[in-house]
């Protein structure tokens, strides 16, 4: 997995990708509130040579801290969209845990 940064006006969002086939689906893992990318360590370990992968530290979580607390769920979905567009992830399969599930539904 390669760590990358998406810059916003409120702070930086850290995320990790492993793209092995640009034409295949990408498993997009979104941790819940108070969790970070490490929540999905076992899943990433299992899938990393089988699928394209994406995971982030949501705004104001772990590596994505400091981050100004002036955002809502729609902002998170917008930033996720910007990142997926930038990474040219066209076939996301979104797996969200707790608050990550809300972001997935909003996306």
Predicted regions and their residues:
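Active-site loop/oxyanion-hole signature of alpha/beta-hydrolase fold enzymes
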Residues: 54-95
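Gly/Ala-rich beta-loop-alpha elbow adjacent to hydrolase catalytic centers
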Residues: 96-100, 104
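N-terminal cap/lid segment of alpha/beta-hydrolase-fold proteins
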Residues: 1-12
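Active-site signature of alpha/beta-hydrolase-fold catalytic machinery across serine-
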Residues: 42, 106-107
């Amino acid at each position: 997995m390669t760590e990358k940064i998406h810059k916003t006006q409120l702070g930086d969002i850290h995320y990790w990708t492993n793209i092995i086939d640009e034409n295949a689906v990408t498993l997009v893992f979104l941790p819940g509130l108070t969790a970070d990318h490490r929540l999905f360590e076992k899943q990433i370990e299992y899938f990393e040579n089988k699928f394209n992968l994406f995971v982030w530290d949501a705004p104001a979580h772990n590596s994505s801290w400091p981050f100004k607390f002036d955002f809502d769920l729609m902002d998170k979905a917008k930033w996720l969209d910007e990142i997926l567009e930038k990474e040219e992830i066209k076939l996301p399969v979104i797996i969200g845990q707790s608050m990550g599930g809300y972001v997935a539904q909003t996306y």
